[in-house]
């Protein structure tokens, strides 16, 4: 029995690289698709937002001389590439998926609106929402917060490379300790980098809880959905 009826799953573009230095690792993509299939089989309604950092990141482009708006638009297109890849992998796993885009680009994907996304999820399709918010200066974390709120998700599941939120970066500080759960106020007070400030405040103001967990460990997504105590819960 799944603990949530409808979720927004945020996936890191960088995680799609797997062992590669750039692009999409087919093995990692297949593992993600299989994990998503497992919770889809539980009857969960699934919306997904994927980053584009494995291909291009607008902010890093700006630091190298790109115009920020054009750089962000390149980043949005990177999320569409990743979304098409995941959609294809889900199809191969026997799960019907639909790509919606925040910018019109038919026939690559359908133009996003809330009602279309909800109807598709209620009909058993996995909905992958790409191209961020369609606007520059917004991260994919902010895009996933917005979409999670719009589709009335019960929770945002933020799949990362680490197994939750720590007092400091566990990859740099061996004394860092993990939170099992933490409030939004505490996240903001401590300046913890769960997501960017805009995304965090949106979730707080709209009472959308987040579970941060390690998506790269196969089986973890189902464990989160069936109530096992992994990751970190962020809530009001």
UniProtKB/Swiss-Prot annotation:
Inhibited by UTP. It comes from the Bacteria. UMP binds at residues 52, 72, 133-140. Pathway: Pyrimidine metabolism; CTP biosynthesis via de novo pathway; UDP from UMP (UMPK route): step 1/1. The keyword Kinase applies. One of its GO terms (cellular component) is cytoplasm. Its EC number is 2.7.4.22. One of its GO terms (molecular function) is ATP binding. It catalyses: UMP + ATP = UDP + ADP. ATP binds at residues 10-13, 53, 57, 160, 166, 169. It is found in: Cytoplasm. Gene3D superfamilies: Acetylglutamate kinase-like. Keywords: ATP-binding, Cytoplasm, Kinase, Nucleotide-binding, Pyrimidine biosynthesis, Transferase. GO terms for biological process: 'de novo' CTP biosynthetic process; UDP biosynthetic process. The keyword Kinase applies. InterPro entries: AceGlu_kinase-like_sf, Asp/Glu/Uridylate_kinase, Uridylate_kinase, Uridylate_kinase_bac. Catalyzes the reversible phosphorylation of UMP to UDP. Belongs to the UMP kinase family. Homohexamer. NCBIfam families: pyrH_bact (TIGR02075). This is Uridylate kinase. It comes from Phocaeicola vulgatus (strain ATCC 8482 / DSM 1447 / JCM 5826 / CCUG 4940 / NBRC 14291 / NCTC 11154).
């Amino acid at each position: 029995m799944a603990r949530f009826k409808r979720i927004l799953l945020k996936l890191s573009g960088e995680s799609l690289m797997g062992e590669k230095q750039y692009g999409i690792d087919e093995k990692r993509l297949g593992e993600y698709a299989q994990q998503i299939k497992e919770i889809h089989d539980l009857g969960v309604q699934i919306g997904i937002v994927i980053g584009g950092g494995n291909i291009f990141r607008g902010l890093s482009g700006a630091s190298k001389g790109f115009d920020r708006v054009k750089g962000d638009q390149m980043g949005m297109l990177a999320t569409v590439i990743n979304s098409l890849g995941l959609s294809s992998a889900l199809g191969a796993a026997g799960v019907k998926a639909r790509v919606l885009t925040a910018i019109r680009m038919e026939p690559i994907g359908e133009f996003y609106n809330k009602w279309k996304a909800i109807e598709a999820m209620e009909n058993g399709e996995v909905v992958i929402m790409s191209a961020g918010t369609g606007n520059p200066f917004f991260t994919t974390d902010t895009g996933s917060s917005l979409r999670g709120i719009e589709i009335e998700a019960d929770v945002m599941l933020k799949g990362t490379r680490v197994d939750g939120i720590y007092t400091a970066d566990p990859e740099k500080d061996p004394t860092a300790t993990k939170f099992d759960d933490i409030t939004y106020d505490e996240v903001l007070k401590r300046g913890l980098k769960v997501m960017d400030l805009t995304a965090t405040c949106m979730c707080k103001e709209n009472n959308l809880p987040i579970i941060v967990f390690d998506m790269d460990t196969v089986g973890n997504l189902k464990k989160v959905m069936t109530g096992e105590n992994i990751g970190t819960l962020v809530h009001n």
